[in-house]
């Protein structure tokens, strides 16, 4: 996994430089879509098919995109296909997203809640977390009933776990240590 990230990083950084010089929002959508399409098993099979030429693979991939494709994006796909690295696109997209967040002073926040969290409670929680972390946060909410109550929040490497399950685990640890 680390090797994949290492190989994908220069592509993501170069792509980010090109995107910053143009329309970053449009590039973000395109790169995200490219990563999703490259992750589809059928597309992986097409990329690995020895009967198809590199131009055919690039053409099939580009035809699957719904977003407008710039000359630079076509060049990137051609380069990745030529080097048999089309499978790197999901990792390139992930690293591109991290670079964009860093340039905007933003971050993704993974919020796991025991119950569905939306509307005003979610907005209030995100606002509180933005003050704590000093960043604009983009929430991704999942529901995990095993938390019993409360939330588990992860921003980058930092985790805040205020769930009932975590508190019970702390109590168990304290009681068994005594």
Curated annotation (Swiss-Prot):
Pfam family of the protein (one): OSCP
Topology of this chain in the membrane: Peripheral membrane protein
Spans through the membrane: none
UniProt key word DNA-binding: no
Gene Ontology cellular component list: plasma membrane; proton-transporting ATP synthase complex
Major location (coarse): membrane
Keyword Transport carried by entry: yes
Location of this chain's protein in the cell: Cell inner membrane
Domain of life of the organism encoding this protein: Bacteria
Sequence similarity: Belongs to the ATPase delta chain family.
Protein name according to UniProt: ATP synthase subunit delta
UniProt source species: Ralstonia nicotianae (strain ATCC BAA-1114 / GMI1000) (Ralstonia solanacearum)
Name of the gene this protein is made from: atpH
């Amino acid at each position: 996994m680390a090797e994949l990230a290492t190989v994908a990083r220069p592509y993501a950084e170069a792509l980010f430089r090109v995107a910053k010089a143009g329309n970053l929002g449009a590039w973000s959508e395109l790169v995200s879509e490219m990563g999703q399409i490259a992750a589809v098993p059928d597309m992986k099979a097409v990329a690995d098919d020895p009967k198809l030429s590199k131009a055919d693979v690039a053409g099939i991939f580009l035809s699957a995109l719904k977003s407008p494709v710039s000359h630079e994006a076509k060049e990137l796909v051609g380069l990745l296909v030529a080097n048999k690295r089309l499978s790197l696109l999901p990792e390139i997209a992930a690293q591109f997203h991290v670079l964009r967040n860093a340039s905007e002073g933003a971050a993704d926040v993974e919020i796991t809640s025991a119950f569905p969290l939306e509307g005003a409670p979610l907005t209030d929680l995100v606002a509180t977390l933005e003050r704590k972390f000093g960043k604009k946060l983009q929430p991704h909410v999942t529901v995990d009933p095993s938390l019993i109550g409360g939330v588990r929040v992860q921003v980058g490497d930092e985790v805040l776990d205020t769930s009932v399950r975590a508190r019970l685990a702390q109590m168990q640890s304290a009681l068994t240590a005594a």
